[in-house]
């Protein structure tokens, strides 16, 4: 583990990987036209000058391009990953070293991330990303979040400082909750206002994923949201591209790297048919699997049926399928009692943000069960009767734990959304009182437009009379905010 304190503070696995990481970043830049175009467009204006951005998002090669885009637009950045398994260590090393540094003289961005963190290390990294030495409040003035963990930590810190105490660790509902409480016990002392002061200067947060957006809407509904937020996840160029086409690519990449099992001819169950589920089902069918979908929503269920998938309950197929993938963003989708009914050597994985879709704690508590590591993030679980299940990434994101996540081109869409959302909140604070917003439609269309040339797309241009006929401007936006793409 490399920790260096000279010009920058950071903690990564191995700085010697920086050259490899830099080569992959250079390749990714070519595949990320949205971000590179934004760098060029805004380089002179420096719209993020003065921004202190705390990032909590998977520390991948693609994220490295995002980080260096924020820096190119004037921001200072501190970064942590948002998943214990998702960091690509060579990318983290390259960011810590920087484009002009060396492993012996790192000159990059403070990043706190490595693959295979413990929960304690993970939340320490998040705390470090939120800690800004030599600043008035000791913290950021912007957050770029994925899953909402950085936002959660700030809000819980403020809540407990207001209450005057942190709940007892004995009240923790999970191992992760216990770690969070321990961290806040350590950072909140009598009369401490660390988190309250830190939150006071935050202009806003831009949130990447469905689960984090749910948290934001819950806090706003409860009246506890401390600063404005832009829901990047529901930008069309994020949810309809990253969620669907990204998962279509990365799900089978993760399964193949983890197991080398032929997918063709297998029966695969996809739990959930939202944008992520749609991409997963399509990828599995493309490999020749017979795909079955489970759904709670009648609209999504009807979509799945009309797309040609059997839609039924998990109970109906639990003992028949070979592959199970959870995609819901909900909890307790596949329970230990379900896994006890599965076939020998069934593969179980999750592609939703958190690790609570699959009941890993319940699985571990089955009497006589034996867990064995095949290789990192691939484990067999042997039941007393000899049956074995293959569980990927310990129930966490398999596409990042077992593979490298979504490809650069699709992430260019999402990260262009993130960059424009950061500019929007940072430069227009008076236009965004505390609430949860979506990315303005003209910016959503801008992001799509930035990616067309790379694919050889030529747009038709409306004539003025045509634009007037449908009630839009010639240059757009072309759809209403409620249009469903």
Curated annotation (Swiss-Prot):
Does 4Fe-4S count among this protein's keywords?
no
Q: Name one GO cellular component term.
A: cytosol
Q: Which InterPro entries match?
A: Adenosylhomocyst_ase-like_sf (IPR042172), Adenosylhomocysteinase-like (IPR000043), Ado_hCys_hydrolase_NAD-bd (IPR015878), NAD(P)-bd_dom_sf (IPR036291), S-Ado-L-homoCys_hydrolase_CS (IPR020082)
Subcellular location, principal = cytoplasm
N-terminal signal peptide: none
SUPFAM superfamilies recorded: Formate/glycerate dehydrogenase catalytic domain-like, NAD(P)-binding Rossmann-fold domains
Q: How is the cofactor bound?
A: Binds 1 NAD(+) per subunit.
Binding residues for substrate: 60, 146, 208, 238, 242
One of this protein's GO BP terms?
A: S-adenosylmethionine cycle
Q: What does this protein do?
A: May play a key role in the regulation of the intracellular concentration of adenosylhomocysteine.
Name of the molecule in the record = Adenosylhomocysteinase
What species is given as this protein's source? Answer: Streptomyces avermitilis (strain ATCC 31267 / DSM 46492 / JCM 5070 / NBRC 14893 / NCIMB 12804 / NRRL 8165 / MA-4680)
The taxonomy runs:
Bacteria, Bacillati, Actinomycetota, Actinomycetes, Kitasatosporales
């Amino acid at each position: 583990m490399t920790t260096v304190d000279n010009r920058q503070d950071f903690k990564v696995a191995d700085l010697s990987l920086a050259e490899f990481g830099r080569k992959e970043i250079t390749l990714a830049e070519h595949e990320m036209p949205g971000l590179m175009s934004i760098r060029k467009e805004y380089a002179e204006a420096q719209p993020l000058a003065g921004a202190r951005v705390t990032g909590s998002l998977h520390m991948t090669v693609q994220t490295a391009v995002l980080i260096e885009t924020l820096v190119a637009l004037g921001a200072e950045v501190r970064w942590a990953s948002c998943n214990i398994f998702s960091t690509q260590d060579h990318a983290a090393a390259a960011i810590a070293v920087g484009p002009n540094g060396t492993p012996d003289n790192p000159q990059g961005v403070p990043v706190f991330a490595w693959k295979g963190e413990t929960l304690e290390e993970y939340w320490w990294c998040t705390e470090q990303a939120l800690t800004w030495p030599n600043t008035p409040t000791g913290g950021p003035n912007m957050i770029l979040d994925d899953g909402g963990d950085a936002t959660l930590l700030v809000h819980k810190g403020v809540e407990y400082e207001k209450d005057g105490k942190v709940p007892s660790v004995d009240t923790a509902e999970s191992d992760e909750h216990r770690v969070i409480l321990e961290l806040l016990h350590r950072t909140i002392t009598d009369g401490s206002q660390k988190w309250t002061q830190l939150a006071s200067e935050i202009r806003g947060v831009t949130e990447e994923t469905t689960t984090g957006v749910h948290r934001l809407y819950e806090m706003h509904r409860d009246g506890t949201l401390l600063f404005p937020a832009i829901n990047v996840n529901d930008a069309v160029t994020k949810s309809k591209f990253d969620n669907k086409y990204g998962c279509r690519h990365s799900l089978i990449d993760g399964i193949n790297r983890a197991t080398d099992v032929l997918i063709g001819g297998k029966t695969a169950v996809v739990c959930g048919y939202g944008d992520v589920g749609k991409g997963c089902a399509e990828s599995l069918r493309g490999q020749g699997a017979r795909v079955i979908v489970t759904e709670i929503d009648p609209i999504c269920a009807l979509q799945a049926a009309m797309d040609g998938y059997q839609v039924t309950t998990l109970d109906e197929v639990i003992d028949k399928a070979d592959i199970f993938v959870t995609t819901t963003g909900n909890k307790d989708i596949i329970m230990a009692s379900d896994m006890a009914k599965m076939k020998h050597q069934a593969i179980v994985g999750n592609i939703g943000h958190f690790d609570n879709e699959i009941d890993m704690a319940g699985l571990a508590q089955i009497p006589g069960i034996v867990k064995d590591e095949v290789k990192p993030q691939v484990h067999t679980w042997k039941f007393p009767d000899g049956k074995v299940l293959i569980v990927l990434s310990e129930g966490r994101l398999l596409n990042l734990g077992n593979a490298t996540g979504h490809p650069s081109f699709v992430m260019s869409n999402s990260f262009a959304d993130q960059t424009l959302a950061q500019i929007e909140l940072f430069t227009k604070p008076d236009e965004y009182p505390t609430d949860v917003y979506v990315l303005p439609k003209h910016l959503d269309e801008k992001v799509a437009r930035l990616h067309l040339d790379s694919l050889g797309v030529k747009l038709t241009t409306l004539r003025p009379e045509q634009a007037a006929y449908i009630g839009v401007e010639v240059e757009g936006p072309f759809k209403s905010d409620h249009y469903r793409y």
